[in-house]
């Protein structure tokens, strides 16, 4: 069975919600989906003061976990147009995997959230994708046969480079149905590609 890791970091829960939708899509394709998160680096008292969502059920990932999967779908909120430092720190610890070529040929994809419609979604996705390319991974985006990213009747996330959501500056906007659909589509699409490549 094709194994897919949904690896994420979430501050207020938006990326956690997207990760769950991605995993639903993976499972719909008949693949195994494991959801793991990277460690929080913000001190707990600071995180509580700023209302971080600390009760996330997903187990903490280690870089060594990545080798076991056929595909890795990475989710992170934006920080000034790039991935959050927590996710960057995790990937900075994957030098040993790079030295062994352990991730070469695996499928990689990305999803993100931003505060606003033009808050750096695509640059954040590319900041993730760059790491995956350096590891030798085969990149998948969110193809345009997911028609939800073409909608003009509502403000919504979605890009050909990955699934996205808009959270609002204070995290008050919930992930929309359309954005969940995009995340599910991404998960299913990646799982289907990984199954073909590992056959």
Swiss-Prot record:
SUPFAM superfamilies linked: Flavoproteins
Molecular function GO labels: flavin adenine dinucleotide binding; FMN binding; NAD binding; NADH:ubiquinone reductase (non-electrogenic) activity; NADP binding; NADPH dehydrogenase (quinone) activity
Keywords: Flavoprotein, FMN, NAD, NADP, Nucleotide-binding, Oxidoreductase
Organism, as annotated: Gluconacetobacter diazotrophicus (strain ATCC 49037 / DSM 5601 / CCUG 37298 / CIP 103539 / LMG 7603 / PAl5)
Superkingdom of source: Bacteria
EC number: 1.6.5.2
Top EC category: oxidoreductase
Any Pfam family hit: FMN_red
Protein name (Swiss-Prot/TrEMBL): NAD(P)H dehydrogenase (quinone)
Required co-factors: FMN
Domain annotation Flavodoxin-like: ranges: 4-190
Residues at which NAD(+) binds: 12
Residues binding substrate: 98
Cystines in this chain: none
A single cellular component GO annotation: membrane
Residues that, per the record, bind FMN: 10-15, 78-80, 113-119, 134
Family named by the database record: Belongs to the WrbA family.
Cofactor binding summary note: Binds 1 FMN per monomer.
Keyword Nucleotide-binding: yes
Catalytic activity: a quinone + NADH + H(+) = a quinol + NAD(+); a quinone + NADPH + H(+) = a quinol + NADP(+)
